[in-house]
């Protein structure tokens, strides 16, 4: 236990900062069960080291995700709540439902739902601990190999990765399953055994029960070898990104679109990499090699009068004004509106960023109206007209969006600053002539 705790503490100390909340993905299986005990011990040690008897100064919380797939799930949730209470760690249960008729694998659906549920508990800077270990790493590597993945996929799992504004950390990634089980038994811990883990119809279980024992018996150092290969692949990926970073920054536009003109100056291999970097930045799933070719040949190079698009899993790649855009399904926000106060960031709906009417800007372009309390923000351009300072007369917003080259799918996603029934400014596009001045600036900070 001491050796394993020491490794756990070393990993945690690489990422933990005072005031950070730690969230444990707690399934009740042996991996997360042991993590709960390690986290509880770390919490107590932290309180002693910081001369505090208040264990809550070290903020941690466990989350059990109830998928509803097993008749035992309610019992498992109850056990997790009890174990967490005994460990002195708060715990909550998140219930999710899966669309088992979607055609997707149950494994993938459960994984996506699980991480969506966990993301609700993560705020900026928080840590999410998960229980993946060295055997999981080998399985992930072999599954990527089976899919024909390149270096990115073969990099498998990193010790840490960005997640929901915080960081996902895998403290047990260098530890074998047999060592985890041995320590758990040594400590007298109980844990849940998910019956689905024995079902070899699932690829990961097939590898775990049929393939891994054979590999480990033939090559006892297979775990270290796979970890080394995965690490080398990850290094190659990082090097490629580093070498192409300057090119990528030139191609990436302020609205997160990608310049086709810039892409066209590079080789096919470089173009494919730049598109992958772009989609990764936008948190989209990576396309296949076939899809990468389609993005270039059938979207980027389509006839100029065409409106090409390629549907991928989480959204679609579209072309507009010689740029590639990543378009996800959007929620209608045209009924949303809110008052706005000067020098106070207004959080916009559906991750559309934040809006600030700043009176401290050196680039002020707006005259403050006589009754600032009547200022409001809307997203509905229907029936509205405006007279931009750069235009000779007033026009409907629908026409102005066309003139300002705003893609059709973004026109109801741009915040409009209103004063009573008059348009003051539209996003970062223009200010109406009637409100032109030097009192304040409308600053729109967009989210990815």
Curated annotation (Swiss-Prot):
One GO cellular component, as annotated: cytoplasm
Lipid biosynthesis as UniProt keyword: no
Role: Ligates lysine onto the cytidine present at position 34 of the AUA codon-specific tRNA(Ile) that contains the anticodon CAU, in an ATP-dependent manner. Cytidine is converted to lysidine, thus changing the amino acid specificity of the tRNA from methionine to isoleucine.
Species the sequence originates in: Vibrio campbellii (strain ATCC BAA-1116)
Residues holding ATP: 27-32
Family: Belongs to the tRNA(Ile)-lysidine synthase family.
Keywords, in A-Z order: ATP-binding, Cytoplasm, Ligase, Nucleotide-binding, tRNA processing
Official protein name in the record: tRNA(Ile)-lysidine synthase
Protein localization: Cytoplasm
Enzyme class: ligase
Any single GO BP term: tRNA modification
């Amino acid at each position: 236990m001491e050796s394993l705790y020491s490794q756990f503490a070393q990993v945690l100390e690489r990422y933990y900062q005072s005031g950070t909340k730690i969230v444990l993905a707690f399934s009740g299986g042996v991996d997360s069960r042991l993590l709960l005990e390690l986290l509880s011990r770390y919490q107590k040690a932290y309180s002693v080291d910081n001369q505090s008897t208040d264990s809550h100064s070290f903020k941690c919380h466990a989350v059990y995700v109830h998928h509803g797939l097993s008749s035992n799930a309610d019992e498992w949730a109850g056990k997790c709540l009890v174990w967490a209470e005994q460990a002195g760690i708060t715990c909550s249960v998140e219930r999710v439902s899966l669309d088992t008729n979607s055609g997707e694998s149950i494994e993938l659906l459960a994984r996506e739902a699980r991480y969506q549920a966990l993301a609700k508990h993560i705020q900026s800077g928080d840590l999410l601990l998960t229980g993946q270990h060295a055997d999981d790493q080998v399985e992930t590597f072999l599954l990527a190999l089976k899919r024909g993945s390149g270096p990115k996929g073969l990099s498998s799992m990193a010790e840490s990765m960005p997640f929901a504004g915080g960081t996902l950390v895998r403290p047990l990634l260098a530890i074998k399953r047999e060592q985890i089980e041995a320590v758990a038994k040594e400590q007298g811990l109980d844990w849940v055994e998910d019956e689905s883990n024995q079902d070899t119809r699932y690829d990961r279980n097939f590898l775990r029960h049929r393939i891994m024992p054979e590999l480990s018996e033939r090559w006892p150092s297979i775990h270290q070898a796979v970890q080394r290969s995965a690490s080398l692949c990850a290094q190659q990926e990082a090097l490629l990104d580093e070498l192409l970073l300057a090119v990528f920054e030139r191609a990436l536009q302020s609205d997160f679109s990608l310049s086709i003109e810039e892409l066209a100056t590079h080789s096919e291999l470089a173009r494919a990499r730049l598109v992958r970097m772009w989609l990764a930045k936008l948190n989209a799933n990576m396309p296949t090699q076939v899809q990468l070719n389609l993005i270039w040949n059938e979207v980027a190079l389509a006839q100029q009068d065409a409106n090409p698009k390629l549907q991928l899993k989480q959204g679609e790649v579209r072309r507009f004004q010689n740029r590639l855009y990543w378009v996800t399904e959007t929620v209608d926000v045209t009924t949303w509106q809110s008052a706005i106060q000067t020098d106070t960031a207004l959080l916009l709906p559906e991750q559309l960023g934040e809006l600030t009417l700043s009176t401290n800007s050196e680039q002020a372009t707006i005259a403050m109206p006589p009754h600032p309390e009547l200022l409001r923000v809307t997203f509905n351009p229907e029936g509205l007209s405006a007279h931009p300072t750069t235009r000779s007369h007033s026009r409907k917003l629908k026409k102005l969006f066309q003139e300002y080259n705003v893609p059709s799918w973004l026109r109801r996603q741009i915040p409009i600053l209103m004063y009573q029934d008059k348009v003051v400014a539209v996003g970062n596009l223009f200010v109406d002539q009637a409100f032109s001045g030097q009192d304040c600036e409308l600053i729109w900070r967009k989210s990815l």
